[in-house]
Amino acid sequence: KASSQKYTAPLVDTPRSVTVIPQQVIKDTNALSLQDALRTVPGITFGAGEGGNPQGDRPFIRGFDAQGDTYLDGVRDTGAQTREIFAIESVEVAKGPNSAIGGRGAAGGTINLVSKRAHLGNSLDGAWTWGSDQTQRYTFDGNYQFSDTVAGRLNLMTHESNVAGRDKVNYDRWGIAPSLAFGLGTPTRVNLDYYHLESDDLPDSGIPYTIPTGGSGARTSADPSKPYAGGDHDNFYGLTGRDFRKSRVDIATFAIEHDLTDSLTIKNTLRHGNSMQDYILTQPDDSKGNVNNGSVWRRANTRVGNTATTTNQTDLFGEFYLGGLKNSFSTGIELSREESERSSYNVDTNTKGSSPTTCTPSLIGANSDYNCTSLSNPNPDDPWNGAISRNYAGTDTKSNTRALYVFDTLELSPEWLLNMGLRYDHFDTQYRTYDASGATVVNSKGVASKSRDTSEFVTGQLGLVWKPAENGSIYVSYATSATPPGALLGEGMEGNPLGNTTDRTGNLLSSDMEPEETTNYEIGTKWDLLDQRLSLAAALFRTEKENARVQVDTTSYENVGETRVQGIELSASGKLTDKWQVFAGYTYMQARQIDGGPLGKA
């Protein structure tokens, strides 16, 4: 069964594809980060910092960007970051549109991290890792029962490593996650959890791409852009004296749960989280074709980002009978406020060439103030001493969410189950733009550069399950999701697609953007075999997105077009014997753009 009470049936009877990565698989694969763990799940790929994205986790589920669809114990975890795994018990990946469970977004699915929490009993676990490239990692996981109803748990981690096959790059981080539980084994239970993670890295943007001599417009299948490092893929084109990436995450959670009766429970979860990301990293840029003459421009990508989130969820769940039919239900309300501030640095990267970004062999080194380096033999320790200053030009985005939801699994008979879910969201987001000094930008009519959007949407899920045997099921399901403008608070590839237009008198006009709408159709089967030691699943799916939002120029977005992803997924997981464990999967996907919109902009 999934950890969230919103799943009202065991996974074998849940009409959607759900993959659970248990603690044993995390240990067996030596996963050190969320990305490591998710690489064991079919249907997930990863992006990087393309298109101005912040550094951090950027998973794609079934081809759809899921950067903003990560949850911690069922609560949205906003803010770009690279997530650790030391305080995580398991990872749950639900595939297909999942807004009914998670709220806005979730076009391809959701990722839920289940925390290590205090429990009854005493346990002690520790691990250390020494490896190549100066890798050192130490973890501690201790649980202690103070009394019949009170327990505490502490998780610690420190990690230092360089990167195999890359010069100079290093990643250093440490974290602590204490947990206290009261009332264990009683009708009223309280959990207090805290999570802190800090990192200090020398980041890596990889190697440059070659551009044909005729420029990017001259690219063909025979002469494409392709990565090229001058013969040595260990080459690092950054600067050890300039580049850095620092991040910090703090999350505090207070949860209280009370059994009203043997079949009815109420739970409230209050959480506040802050995440910070601060970096300057070198992108080996070839926008001017510098690689063709053996040189590379050290472009600087920068970001200063802070995200704060406060969320309160109240859930009522349990079982009841109506007309002689059993209902397993969950209903609740969610209130949240999220704020994201984003700015950057000014970095002097002028090469002193024919243009500020042009490099030639004669400009490599001191003649360009070390903003040009050699393609085949870069020196990361160049004595770069250019100017760096804060640039407060950026945005402040604030969002408020109010949501109501209800889920029910209706047992029509021992062989037939009907799974239903419905959610209403009121999502209000607004942003303000600042200039380099930190002052609010105003237009020619003196109106502040800001905008807002209010979206209301209803999403749902419906599935019919047939159980030919107690240990198996065959299902058909339908699910929807909605992604309103500003859903990522400017923390992802979309930025802020809100209007900044005014009427003739300069009064601000609200955005008229509509939410993107995604629909999933799925048919599948699940079986628990070998006394529930082995779980098998197969599914055919089709996911369609309408109202796709596309950036048509530097400041404008439009709802145009339709896309479709369809495919098949197979999975197997379990413990066959005391010594043999299997965790396998396969996904085949076919993606198409069905309609590019009236102007073909999609």
Model-predicted segments: where are they?
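Outer-membrane beta-barrel translocator/receptor signature
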Residues: 87-89, 100-176, 184-188, 250, ...
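Transmembrane beta-strands of outer-membrane beta-barrel proteins
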Residues: 124-126, 152-154, 190-192, 266-270, ...
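Acidic/polar loop-and-plug regions of large Gram-negative outer-membrane beta-barrel proteins
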Residues: 159-164, 171, 176-259, 274-307, ...
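Structural signature of Gram-negative outer-membrane beta-barrels, strongest in the C-terminal barrel
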Residues: 181-185, 307, 326-328, 334-338, ...
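Gram-negative outer-membrane beta-barrel transporters
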Residues: 533-535, 539-544, 559-602
